[in-house]
Each structure stands twice: as C-alpha cells, then as structure tokens.
C-alpha cells in the first residue's frame, strides 16, 4: 500500500469509531476532516464494479457551462451521476451509512430539519488531467452571500475514495479554515492548499464554503472518488430522482427514499414540505419500502 505523504497531516484524520461530536468539532474548526474507513473494502469493490460500465461509456468534460460559476473541468474529468439507478450498493449501503447519518443529523436537524441529496456523482480523473481551480461549492446558492459568521452551513460534502488519492494522481486540495473567510480575502493561492491523501474507503467530510479543488493527475492511472453533496430539504437538488423506476425506489429504505426526494420532509419547526397536495408524498403514492437488509 502506498505510504501517505507527510503533508496529509495538515488535514486531521479520525478513526471509524470516532463520535459524531468529535467529528463535528473538527469540521467546524477546519472545514474538513478525513473519516478513515468510512466504507469497508467489500462495499468499495462492489460499488466500483457496478459503476464501471457507466464510467466507460461517459464522455469527459464539463456537463454544463454555467455563467458566473468558474470551476475548471477538463476533457479528462468525468462527473457521472444517476447512481441510484446504476448502483445497488449506492442505494442500499451508501445512502444508509449509519456513521454518515449520525453526523448529518446534528448538523442539519436543529437548523433546517430534514436533509436530502443535492447530487451524488463519481468524480473520475484520467492521467494527464491538470489541476482544478480552487473554488467553493456553495456558490450554487445566492443566499450564501447573506450568511453571517457562525451561521450553519448550507451544504455538507462527503468525498469517498474509490481508488487511492495521492499527490501524483489528483488528490483533492483543501485550504483548511477558509470556510470562515469573507469575500475580502479573495481566492487562495495553490500554495495555501494541502492535499488529502486517502486509501480506498476513506472519506473527506467538508463544508460547501471551504476552498478546494482536485489536483493534477500526473500518474499513469485514473483517480476515482464518490461525491455525496447534501443540503437541507428546503433547497431544490441539482439532481432529480423522479425518473428512477418505482420498483427500484421501493426496494430502498425510507431513509434512502427521503435522501432522493421520494418522501416528504419536515423542517426544524415540524412543518411538512414536499407534499402531495395536503398529504405526505409517500402516503398519497402508496409508496412501499424495505428495511436495511
């Protein structure tokens, strides 16, 4: 196994049995923390095998070119979504990850209520792909400009290593502490960023307001990660799941169904949202579900 570079110590790491309270404390302090062994190796291997055909068939480059959002995505980068329909491991194991929800609940519940997926996607970087510019993910929301210091974050990201993340193959770079910067600080320079080396199954938990960007892949093999982008149910997701066949959705747990928008949510004030008329979506639709197997 490849040895992790020494600069990885700039981003703190926690073991799989670390309490949610300790994880959240580090997240609030630095904006990013590595969760070691977030997924076991069997889960990583199953997911890798299930997504391979979709990755192979997908054309590299940006999926869209929005005005005012400057995020460099080259032809050697593939961002592949629709994972609920593609991967059984994703919809049954990853969306139900207990450690993940034990962290997300206290981050979202007191301030917003329920949360769901903004988007789940595989980030695949081919050899020769240059480094991505440093950016913040929460620029999606105009309301981020209204946030005050200490306000809860609107987006929580979990980037899971499907392959190794190393300096030479495009390990994501972060600027710890930059989540509390205001706009007067400007864009950080590359020398302010620390790379985050990961082994398959490790994950990076980071807030949407943190400056970060994928590194350059100077190796002879691709680098692959799974990005789970999560936000309150108040916000419209980037990725809709209404097209996912009902037979697939009904094979999922209630929690996983809510994560993809097939169930109604509740705000922090116990106000129901995403209703079907005056009733919960799942009740009106007669939606079935399965418990964790």
UniProtKB/Swiss-Prot annotation:
One of its GO terms (biological process) is terpenoid biosynthetic process. It is an enzyme of class 1 (oxidoreductase). This is Dioxygenase cdmA. GO terms for molecular function: dioxygenase activity; metal ion binding. Compounds in the chrodrimanin family such as chrodrimanin A or verruculide A exhibit strong inhibitory activities against protein tyrosine phosphatase 1B (PTP1B) and therefore, they could potentially be developed into drugs for the treatment of type 2 diabetes or obesity. Furthermore, chrodrimanin B, the end product of the pathway involving chrodrimanin A or verruculide A, does not exhibit the PTP1B inhibitory activity, while it functions as a potent blocker of insect GABA-gated chloride channels. Its EC number is 1.14.11.-. Disulfide bonds: none annotated. It comes from the Eukaryota. It comes from Talaromyces verruculosus (Penicillium verruculosum). Homodimer. Keywords: Dioxygenase, Iron, Metal-binding, Oxidoreductase. SUPFAM superfamilies: Clavaminate synthase-like. Pathway: Secondary metabolite biosynthesis; terpenoid biosynthesis. Coiled coil: none annotated. It catalyses: chrodrimanin C + 2-oxoglutarate + O2 = verruculide A + succinate + CO2 + H2O; chrodrimanin H + 2-oxoglutarate + O2 = chrodrimanin E + succinate + CO2 + H2O. The gene is cdmA.
């Amino acid at each position: 196994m490849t040895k992790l570079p020494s600069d990885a110590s700039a981003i703190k790491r926690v073991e799989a049995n670390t309490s949610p309270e300790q994880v959240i404390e580090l997240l609030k302090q630095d904006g990013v923390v590595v969760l070691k062994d977030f997924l076991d190796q069997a889960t990583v291997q199953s997911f890798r095998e299930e997504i391979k055909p979709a990755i192979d068939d997908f054309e590299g480059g940006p999926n869209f070119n929005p005005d005012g959002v400057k995020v460099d995505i080259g032809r050697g980068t593939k961002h592949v979504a629709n994972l609920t329909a593609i991967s059984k491991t994703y919809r049954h194991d990853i969306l139900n990850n207990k450690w993940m929800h034990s962290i997300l609940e206290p981050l979202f519940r007191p301030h917003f209520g329920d949360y769901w997926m903004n988007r789940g996607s595989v980030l695949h970087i081919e050899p020769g792909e240059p480094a991505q510019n440093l950016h913040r993910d929460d620029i999606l929301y105009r309301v981020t400009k209204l946030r005050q210091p200490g306000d809860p974050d609107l987006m929580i990201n979990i980037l899971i290593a499907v392959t190794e993340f190393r300096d030479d193959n495009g390990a994501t770079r972060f600027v710890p502490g930059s989540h509390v910067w205001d706009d007067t600080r400007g864009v950080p320079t590359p020398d302010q960023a620390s790379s985050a080396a990961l082994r398959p199954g490790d994950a990076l938990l980071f807030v949407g307001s943190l400056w970060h960007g994928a590194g350059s892949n100077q190796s002879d093999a691709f680098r692959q990660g799974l990005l789970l982008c999560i936000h309150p149910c108040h916000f419209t997701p980037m990725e809709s799941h209404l097209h996912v066949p009902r037979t697939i959705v009904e094979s999922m747990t209630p929690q996983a169904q809510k994560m993809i928008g097939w169930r109604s949510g509740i705000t922090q004030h116990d106000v129901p949202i995403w209703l079907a008329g005056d009733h919960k979506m799942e009740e009106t639709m007669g939606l079935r579900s399965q418990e964790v197997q």
